[in-house]
Structures are given as C-alpha cells and as structure tokens.
Amino acid sequence: MFLHTKLENRKEPIRIAFIGCGKFVSMFLAQYNHLDKIQIDSIVDLNIEQAKRNCSNSGLDETTISEINFSKSLDEILDRNIEIFIEATGNPIFGTVHAVKIIKNKKHVILVNVEADITCGKYLSDIAKENGVICSMAYGDQPSLIIEQIEWARLNGFSVVCAGKGLSLIHI
C-alpha cells in the first residue's frame, strides 16, 4: 500500500515534534496546511519567538500556532504523546544527544541533520535497533538523496563505484 493511502487510513493523525525550527522545518511548515493526518505537537528551539515567526511566515494561522507546544528543552517534551521526532538543528553534537535521548525513550527519530548522521549515524542506528524504534534520514537531505541515486543506478544495472555530493566544490 502506498504511504499516502496508509496515512489517510489512520484514525488519528501522526503526532510529531520538531527540534530546531529553521529552513528545513519552515519548508515543511509551508505544506502543513495541506496535511490532514499529521499534527505538530511540539517545536523545540532556543529562540521560541523566532520559531513562532517562522511558523507564521510559513503560512500557519494564529490558531494553529497556539495549539503547538513550544519549548527550549527536549527534556520537557519527551513524555508527551509524540510518535516521531524530527531532529533538524544541524549541529552534530546536539543532534546526536537529542537523537540518543529520543531513541532511549522508545520514540522514532528522523534526522534532518546530515552532520549528526555522518558522525554518529551507525551508532544511532544500532541503539535504535536495540530499542525497537526507527532512526531514519529525512527524504530531501543529502544522505537520503544519495541513497536514492545509488538505488536508481543499481536498479538500472549500473555498478556504483563512488557516490557523494560535490556541489560545494563547484565555484559558480
């Protein structure tokens, strides 16, 4: 069954939380009004007022924003009824610390934090497996796009000898 159909067949929406409310999360928020079965429970950010402005600038109305729990601390929201945490700080140290706390609390985590993934991804995957939860990369972040390209190449019969992102090496 396709993912959208599975989502639509749920009785209750998936409750999510964001850690970090910058560019990536703002892009998600811009689509949020069109997502029926996803509910933002919480947003953790060091600058709550800026996070609220990002929500507003992304098209969320004041009623929707008022229903979101904003916090400066992940610890304050770990016991809430949240199914999936999206770690989007872009900081490898904080991202890893956040992911470990989430995983050890038996919650799923999506990393929009390539920095944490490249430094500690294997470790996070191992402890997620031990705790019976999923630690995944976000579609659209560099590692998941590279994996998609590798899978496409292999499905089309190509042998992949190297894969990566070289855009930052090109001077335009």
Q: Positions of the model-derived regions?
A:
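N-terminal Rossmann-like dinucleotide-binding module
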Residues: 1-58
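Short, ordered loop/turn segments at secondary-structure junctions
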Residues: 46, 90, 114-117, 140-141, ...
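A structured beta-alpha segment of the ubiquitous adenosine-cofactor-binding alpha/beta core
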Residues: 62-93
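Rossmann-fold NAD(P)-binding glycine/threonine-rich loop
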Residues: 96, 101, 114-133
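A short hydrophobic/small-residue beta-strand
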Residues: 108-110
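Rossmann-fold dehydrogenase core element
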Residues: 124-140, 156-162
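Oxidoreductase and adenylate-handling cofactor-binding alpha/beta cores
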Residues: 145-159
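Conserved small/polar residues in nucleotide/adenosyl-binding loops
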Residues: 170-172
